[in-house]
Amino acid sequence: MGKSTAARMVVDTLAAAGLPMHATAQPSRAPLGELARHGTDTYRGMALACLCAADRHHQLEVEIKPALRQGKVVVCDRYVASSLVLQGLDGLSSDTVWQLNHGVYCPDLTVILNADPQVLDSRLRGRGGHSRFERAEDNSDMESGLYVHAVVDLQAKGWPVATLDLTTDTPDTIAARIVFLIRRVLQEKSPACV
């Protein structure tokens, strides 16, 4: 199970429980996001980082903030942590990524899904890589390590982070754990909400 599958399952579960939900992903489906999503073979380093950050800033203004103002719970499949990792794979420093993402919202919860690199490689071989990052040989070791660094970086900046290991858990178990974490955050914010 990957990040997108987990996000869909979480949104479906919370929506079925009656919570007003807004599901989104990054890169977005806006033109900037599509350029970033389909341009990983063309754009690298700072160019790709700028595309991803521009898409994130745009999406925040036109999609995420309006959904939050409407009282919806927003679940975003990928956010700043993904940029810290992917742009890190391209050799950019986390400081550079943070500069490009200055002013983005700090979410109420960031969930990092990671797994044993061999398991990640096996899953990617099974479904095929969608981007040059996923198609690269043995990239999972480096990606997993960068996610560990991203967690430390996010926490140092005051972002609430939970890390879940996908190595052995089923998709249903992972989704249930994320739903529990979101419900706990919502309960802390507004007990009447959940």
Task: Locate the predicted segments by residue.
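Walker A/P-loop
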Residues: 4
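ATP-binding Walker
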Residues: 1
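Conserved acidic residues
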Residues: 72, 108, 161
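ATP-dependent small-molecule kinase phosphotransfer cores
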Residues: 19-99
